[in-house]
Amino acid sequence: MMRLKEKYTQNIKPALVKEFDIKNPMLIPFIEKVVISVGAGELAKDQKVLQNVADTISLIAGQKAVITKAKKSVAGFKVREGFPVGVMVTLRKDNMYAFLDKLITIALPRVKDFRGLPRDGFDGRGNYNFGLDEQLMFPEVEYDKILRTHGMNISIVTTAKSDKEAQKLLELFGVPFAKGK
């Protein structure tokens, strides 16, 4: 059993029930999925670089990443329908807990001058979004094999009804938020 999954069932669930006075056990908030995405932009023009980005995200996530394609042509961005525009992977269950554990305990502490994740990344529906500037903080990524550094967006989707519930859930998981607010 995953460390964070065990922590959720033994410690976090009872704490959430107590804090938010939840009567129905099916209403206890949990993390549904984690989506990691990279908008390739200029990188999408070079197929080799885009494949390298997909391989890197696959290494980080522990699951095969998918190259996303444009749904519509947009002349202003010089994008045609069907052109590759990014890379994404959706993590659920054990892969999700493994990634979150790695992110919280290994990757985020390696970020230079890290003061916590911003609290304004909540969307009003209990989901949290934040971005990372580069992929080199993850231990699986080898600097020599990277063609270009790139950032990534990480979305943590929860079943929480409010931002307050979602923030408490993530804090109990050990997500380091910035001080203030």
From Swiss-Prot:
**Cellular component, GO, one term:** ribonucleoprotein complex
Q: Which InterPro entries match?
A: Ribosomal_uL5, Ribosomal_uL5_bac-type, Ribosomal_uL5_C, Ribosomal_uL5_CS, Ribosomal_uL5_dom_sf, Ribosomal_uL5_N
Q: Does tRNA-binding count among this protein's keywords?
A: yes
Please verify whether the record's keywords include Transmembrane: no
Which Pfam family is one of those matched by this entry? Ribosomal_L5
Q: Name one GO biological process term.
A: translation
Tell me the domain of life: Bacteria
Question: Which keywords belong to this entry?
Answer: Ribonucleoprotein, Ribosomal protein, RNA-binding, rRNA-binding, tRNA-binding
UniProt GO molecular function? rRNA binding; structural constituent of ribosome; tRNA binding
HAMAP family xrefs: Ribosomal_uL5_B (MF_01333_B)
The family annotation for this protein states: Belongs to the universal ribosomal protein uL5 family.
Q: What does this protein do?
A: This is one of the proteins that bind and probably mediate the attachment of the 5S RNA into the large ribosomal subunit, where it forms part of the central protuberance. In the 70S ribosome it contacts protein S13 of the 30S subunit (bridge B1b), connecting the 2 subunits; this bridge is implicated in subunit movement. Contacts the P site tRNA; the 5S rRNA and some of its associated proteins might help stabilize positioning of ribosome-bound tRNAs.
Q: How does it assemble?
A: Part of the 50S ribosomal subunit; part of the 5S rRNA/L5/L18/L25 subcomplex. Contacts the 5S rRNA and the P site tRNA. Forms a bridge to the 30S subunit in the 70S ribosome.
**Name of the protein in question:** Large ribosomal subunit protein uL5
